[in-house]
A protein has these predicted regions:
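ATP-dependent adenylate-forming carboxylate-activation enzymes
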Residues: 1-3, 17-23, 155-175, 184-186, ...
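A short helix-loop-beta submotif of the ANL/AMP-binding
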Residues: 1-12, 29-30, 129-130, 148-158, ...
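Structural core segment of the AMP-binding/adenylate-forming
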Residues: 1-60
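Gly/Ser/Thr-rich phosphate-binding loop
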Residues: 56-59, 152, 177-182, 191-252, ...
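Conserved pre-ATP/AMP-binding loop-to-beta segment of ANL
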Residues: 59-86, 92-93, 119-130
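Adenylate-forming
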Residues: 96, 107-112, 169-171, 187-194, ...
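Conserved AMP-binding/adenylation subdomain of ANL enzymes
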Residues: 105-130, 137-179, 192-193
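Conserved ATP-binding/catalytic segment of the ANL
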Residues: 274-279, 283-344
C-alpha cells in the first residue's frame, strides 16, 4: 500500500473503517497527509483520531446543482485512465495497470455476449438474478462483476464486508443467490467442508470460476453435488478482467477456460516466436479492446509486455482445439498468488 500511495501520488485516501489502522500507518510511511484520509462506508462515521467521514468532503446542494460533469469524447474515453489496478510479479514492486474507460465498457459488452449467448439480453426478458459480492474490490474480477456488470444489468448484489465461509453460505440461503463468481478455493470449500451441506444452496443455478486454475475433477464434483453449472473463464489485470470464457449456454466439463470474447484476437507463440498449430502449446498473446493502455510510470515493463501493434504477452501457456476452446496448461514465467487469487 505504501508503494501504491507513493506511485500514484494519490490525493485522497478512502478507507473502510475496519482497515483504518493499517491505512493510517501506510499513509504515514508514504508521507501522505493525514487530513486527506477519510472513512468510507454506507453509514456516517464519527471522527477517529482526526480521520473524518467522507461525507464531509461533499459540497452543498447548491454547489452540486452548478457542477457540470465532464463528458469524454470517444477519443478521450479510449486514452483516459479510469482505474489503476496493481499487478505483482515474483520480484520487484507491484506494477500499476492503467485501464481506460473504453477498456471497461468494452469488457462489459464482451462479457455480456458470452453470458447471454443464444438468448439475447433485454431488460424485459432477462431472468431475475441475485449475486453475492465477496471478491476483493481491489481485484479486477471483483470490480467488473460486483460493481460494473451488476450496475449495467441492474442485478442486486449483496456485498460481504469480509469473507467468512459460514456467513457466505448463510447469505446464499437467506438472499436466494442465483449466480456465484468465485475462485477455485471457494469450490474446494464447497467440496470438502462439512458446513456446505448445512445450508440450502438450491437457489444457485450457476457459477463462474476464474482468477486461478481449476481442475475438471473439482469442477465436476461441485457441479454434481450442488446441481449448479460451473463455467470457467480466463483473464488478467492487463485485459481489464477477461479475454476467454465458456459461454453460459454451454455446460462444459472438459476443464476448458472457454472461447475468445468477441473482438478478441489470440496467438499462441513458441519459444522461437513462431505461431503454433491446433493442439500445440504456446504462450498466449491477446489483442483486443480490453487490453490495458500501459503500466503506470513503467515504460520498460510496458515495452516488455505489450508489442507496438497491441499484442499482450500474457506469460500463460495454452493450447486450443478445432472449435476454438482453450486450456491453460502452464505458466511461462513465475506468478504470485495471494488468498487464492492470481495477481500477475
Amino acid at each position: 500500500m505504501v508503494h501504491q500511495i507513493k506511485n500514484t501520488e494519490a490525493r485522497i485516501l478512502l478507507v473502510y473503517p475496519a482497515l483504518l489502522k493499517t491505512a493510517v500507518q501506510a499513509a504515514k510511511e508514504a508521507g501522505f497527509p493525514k487530513d486527506r484520509i477519510f472513512q468510507f462506508s454506507d453509514k456516517p462515521n464519527q471522527s477517529v483520531d482526526g480521520i473524518r467521514d467522507w461525507r464531509e468532503m461533499l459540497g452543498s446542494e447548491e454547489e452540486a446543482n452548478k457542477y457540470s460533469w465532464p463528458k469524454l469524447s470517444p477519443e478521450e474515453a479510449t486514452t483516459t485512465v479510469a482505474t489503476i489496478n496493481y499487478s505483482s510479479g515474483t520480484t520487484g514492486l507491484p506494477k500499476g495497470v492503467c485501464v481506460s474507460h473504453y477498456n471497461i465498457i468494452s469488457n462489459i459488452e464482451q462479457t455480456m455476449v458470452m453470458k447471454y449467448l443464444g438468448q439475447p439480453y433485454t431488460r424485459e426478458t432477462a431472468p431475475s438474478e441475485r449475486w453475492l459480492g465477496f471478491l476483493p474490490l481491489y481485484h479486477a474480477y471483483g470490480q467488473l462483476w460486483t460493481i460494473m456488470m451488476a450496475l449495467k444489468l441492474q442485478v442486486p448484489v449483496y456485498v460481504m464486508t469480509q469473507f467468512v465461509y459460514e456467513d457466505f453460505l448463510k447469505a446464499i440461503q437467506d438472499f436466494k443467490i442465483t449466480q456465484l463468481h468465485v475462485a477455485p478455493p471457494i469450490l474446494v470449500m464447497l467440496s470438502k467442508r462439512p458446513e456446505s451441506t448445512k445450508h440450502d444452496l438450491n437457489s444457485v443455478k450457476g457459477a463462474l470460476c476464474g482468477a486461478a486454475p481449476l481442475s475438471k475433477e473439482l469442477q465436476a464434483d461441485v457441479s454434481t453435488r450442488f446441481k449448479m453449472q460451473i463455467n470457467q473463464g480466463w483473464g488478467m489485470t492487463e485485459v481489464t478482467t477477461g479475454a476467454i470464457m465458456v459461454p453460459f449456454a454451454i455446460n462444459d466439463d472438459t476443464g476448458s477456460v472457454g472461447q475468445l470474447l468477441p473482438n478478441t484476437e489470440c496467438m499462441l507463440i513458441d519459444d522461437d516466436g513462431k505461431e503454433v498449430n491446433v493442439g500445440e502449446r504456446g504462450e498466449l498473446c491477446i489483442r483486443g479492446p480490453q487490453v490495458c493502455l500501459r503500466y503506470w510510470r513503467n515504460e520498460q515493463a510496458t515495452k516488455d509486455t505489450i508489442t507496438p501493434d497491441g499484442w499482450l504477452k500474457t506469460g500463460d501457456v495454452a493450447l486450443y482445439d478445432e472449435k476454438g476452446f482453450f486450456w491453460i496448461v502452464d505458466r511461462k514465467k513465475a506468478s504470485l498468488t495471494h488468498a487464492g487469487m492470481a495477481v500477475c
